[in-house]
Amino acid sequence: MSRIGKAPVIFDNTVQVSVSPANEVVVKGAKSSLTIGMKPNVSAKIDGNKVVLTPNDDTKESRAMHGLYRALIQNAVTGVTKGFSRGLELQGVGYRANVAGKKLELSLGFSHPVIFDIPEGIEIKVEKQTSLTVNGPSKELVGQVAAKIRSFRPPEPYLGKGVRYAGEQIRRKAGKSAGK
């Protein structure tokens, strides 16, 4: 048995968790709802205010999925109660961000602005023109959106310009040295 999978997922009264016959775990909170589809080799049972997962057989795959689904359900419970966020910083002359409706407009030194459609369930806040925060209940989707925004202009090692995660250290390289 997986060490992570053995531990039950404990949730409070503000969260409703249900298991459907199609082996899907539905986690509902005050603001949002998340669904985790599971393979048939792991089953979930609700026991009071905790979810207990058990592998149905002793194959390598079901042991691996046991821990994975437990972590996914824990992330869903945390997501619907507290939510997840990821900060991004824009470093460079003229690099700006602003949100207009469900679109994020980025000026990243290209000849055109980069327009990004904000997915459903994700909220992007622009604190300053050079820093923004991606918020949402799904840890996976928040990370995916932040990575997509970063991929428009990843930080380059010589000047450090680009979109970086908040607090990310960029490994800098020395420029050309003039030879004699």
From Swiss-Prot:
The keyword Ribosomal protein applies. Part of the 50S ribosomal subunit. It holds the Pfam family Ribosomal_L6. One of its GO terms (molecular function) is structural constituent of ribosome. This is Large ribosomal subunit protein uL6. This protein binds to the 23S rRNA, and is important in its secondary structure. It is located near the subunit interface in the base of the L7/L12 stalk, and near the tRNA binding site of the peptidyltransferase center. Disulfide bonds: none annotated. One of its GO terms (biological process) is cytoplasmic translation. Coiled coil: none annotated. Belongs to the universal ribosomal protein uL6 family. Keywords: Ribonucleoprotein, Ribosomal protein, RNA-binding, rRNA-binding. SUPFAM superfamilies: Ribosomal protein L6. One of its GO terms (cellular component) is cytosolic large ribosomal subunit.
